[in-house]
Structures are given as structure tokens and as C-alpha cells.
């Protein structure tokens, strides 16, 4: 007997339940007929530990319309209406970060399902201060490595604070995965110290004892692992840094942010001191940069790099320059007929950006930029808008961007980007270089709609005619050539196990099946070899179709086994 959940445990809800039940009987004939026509089917299966493959008892299996706890053998039985639904499986001690659930098409002749839960990974941090004082209320930030536009970056995972024992806990971690853990800078005292005064505090430390992320080591955890991390924070002097300049057009001082060379912001921003006519900050030894930025009709940006080495830093002058838009020319080479299935992914209002007119030409694509100069932080959008007053329907401009080197990712609403260059540089191979004032060579983009298709089957399939089952795999077509386009992907449901990738740019691909969407660092040769080892190579011609057969995903393994 399965322990079924009682949705109306509270006696106070009995009357409400009766009203709802009664209301369900008061319906007009067409509605009642539709209700009677809805068929309910049994959905059975088992929940297993992804590491040990042992059954998990008392796991919650929630099918939206019905929910139940698994028995001692990990088995469950739901009664769900026909059609698509989502089944979510949870259990304390197992990761809750396994996506949004299992998509199941409910119908007749359903097979028994096997759902896996990943044992929760955790990291316990223990902090010691060099002074021997209590290490309570020390703030830490954890970063997880993500692949943005095919390039690895450290993105913030969460923030943690030590307790009275100097301990912090990171729970429910995605595993297997790697994490970078860094403490925040902390200073003693408050207010404005007298000139020449040296403050003391604890500089940031990244596991296992590095001064900044660039020299830190990632801590890798596996499913179910309970890892430990030891930190020793050393009390050091913080020296005064004064930065002049950085004023707006109206003469008002601009806010100045200070970062280490990885791009990670310092805990304390520079403070404006009227009596000095400059901004002031206190920093430990290290390499930094300060930046100031204004967004709006008159955008401006300035940056200055500096180092602190056993003494105060004076005479820094941060100069800001106006930012300018970057010209973008978009050429569309569309054919009248497209057998490759160039799907329109967007249809609606103009995507030119805030303040644009609805009757202005639409660029038909979006751009995102991710910095090649910093290893920390998010990718940013790069709004395109039609050049105001231009009669050329293909003349656009990229909104003001700060100086630096950026990898470009393109998202075409129709067709695909076949080429993108800036000053003759192929942006699929090299980053976009934006100089002082946001200056860059014009960007030239060509969009085509003669993409091909990749069709195929995962595994040997199931008996012909079966159209029901669970989302069992993700298919990724990993480009074996430089591109700024998103990686073609598709979900494969149980049943006949077929898939179709539409609007695929011509070129060679490695087709792989996995349990979740792939994150790939194209600059990591070992990772590329690991991810593509179990796949099949195909070449897609313009407007052509390629068919492949991919081995089924091994449960709990995460990728195809070919």
C-alpha cells in the first residue's frame, strides 16, 4: 500500500473541500461531458539513488494532479489524466537542483519509469583568525564554473556567513561540480581615520589560501560527498588609496567601484571625500583597478589600474570618456523556399531596444557579450537599434559598451548567422575589441535561411505506435567549427525516441545524448574530448537533412555510451 498524501489533513478545510466537491457536480452539460471524457491512467515506477542504484523510500513523487510517497522498495503509483504533465521527485538529503522535473506524456501502455535522485553534496568551511579571536560573522561567497558562450566563467552560487564557532555550511550543491570559495574583505574600525593612519583588517582569501581567484584552486565535489575546507585569515594593514577625477558632465562626483584583476568587486567601494576633492579607499597589498560609469543619454566610462605594495597610493586620476555606439551592418541572404526548416523563433514587436519606434526596421537577431578580460561575472546583453534617421534598412548600431575584449554570441530570430566580422576579424574565432570611448570597427553580419536538419533516434526505440513516455535525453549538436550561434539542442521523449534539430547551420557536428543540457568550455581540450567521446560526427549541407542513430543515455551516467 502506497502512503498517499491527504490534501485535506486540516479539519478546518473539510467544509471548503465539501464546497469544492459540490461545485464540481454543478456544471453545464458540455463541461460535464468534457470532464467525463478525460481518461486517467496509472503511472508506475521506482525512485533510485543515482550513485548506489538502491531504492529510496519515502521520496515525494508529485504529478501535480496526484502525489504519493514511495514505499520501502522505492516504488510509486500515480493516477494522472491523459496528456502532458510534469513529475517532480524530492527527498531530504538529495539535491533539489536537478531541473524542473520529469516531463511525461501520460497515456495507455505506459512503461514503468525509473527516476534517479542525486545524493546531496555539501561543503563545510572552518575559519581560523591569525589573532586567535573568534571567527564569527565572516562572509564568504561561493562561485560555480559555468560556460558562457562556450567560455568558462565563475558565477556566484551563494553567500554564507560563519557562526560563533567560525563554521559555515554549503548544502544542496550541484555535483559533480567544482566550486571556488572566497572570503570577503573586512576592516577594523569605522569613520574617517586621520591622514597617514593605517587601518587593519583581513584581506580576502580564496580556497585553499590564495589572495585572489586567479591563483585559487577549485574544490571539486562528487554526489553525496561531504567535503571540508579550512581557511586561515591573516590580519594585515590596509593602506589609503586616493583617486581624483571621475566627475559627471554636471561636475558631480561619480561612484567608483574597485575590483581585483579577476573582476571581483571589493567589499567596500571608494568613498567621496569633499575635503580631499577625491575618492578614498583602504586596501591591502594587491593588484586592482578602479572604474566609474554613467549610463543614460550621455554615457561615459573610465578605468585606472594600480597596485598596493606596503604603502599608501596617491596621485591616481581616473579620467572618463564618452561612450559611443558601434555601427552594425546586417545583410540577409534569404531564399524564397527553405527545405532546411529555417524556423521563425520570434514574431512580435520591434526588438530594437528602449525608445525605438515600432515601424523601425527590426534587426532580426540579438547579441550577447561576455568579457574575455575577466573570469568573474555575468554576460551582458547588447541591444541593437536602427540608426536614427538612416534610410538604410540594414543599418543598425550596438548600444554603448565599455572598453575591453568580448566574445560575441548571436541569436537569430529567423535563419542563422553565417558570418560576423569587425574590421576584418572573424568574431567567431576572436573576441570583439572595444577601445577607449567604446570605439570599435564596424560589425558586419550576414544572416542566411538555408539551414539543414538533423533527424535521428536514440537507442533502439520502443514498439511502433507508442507515443507516450518520459523526456529521456537531451540531444546536442556540438559544432566542430567556430561559430557565434547557439548550439542546436532538442529533447527526446520515450516512445519511438526520435528527434529533429531544425535550422542547423551548415558544417560538421558531434551529436551526443545526455541527461541534461550540455555546458561545454570550447577552450578546454580535455573537456571537449570527454563530452564528444560518446557521440557521432555528421556533416550538414545547406538545406540538407542528415539522419543519425545515437546510443541511449545510461541512467545516472549523464551522457551517451557509444
Question: Model-found features: residue ranges?
Answer:
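Short, acidic Ser/Thr/Gly-rich low-complexity loop/linker segments typical of extracellular
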Residues: 65-79, 148-171, 262-278, 372-397, ...
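Short, ordered, surface-exposed loop/turn motifs in non-cytosolic proteins
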Residues: 41-43, 48-65, 82, 129-150, ...
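A short, amphipathic beta-strand motif
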Residues: 41-49, 74, 123-129, 231, ...
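Periplasm-facing N-terminal accessory domains of Gram-negative outer-membrane beta-barrel systems
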Residues: 35-138, 145-149, 169-172
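Short Pro-Gly-centered beta-turn/loop motif in secreted/extracellular proteins
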Residues: 54, 77-84, 169-180, 185-186, ...
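A short, solvent-exposed loop/turn motif at the edges and junctions
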Residues: 85-103, 180-216, 292-303, 401, ...
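Bacterial N-terminal signal peptides
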Residues: 15-29
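Extracellular beta-sheet/turn segments enriched in Thr/Pro/Gly and aliphatic residues
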Residues: 35-37, 102-124, 211-235, 305-323, ...
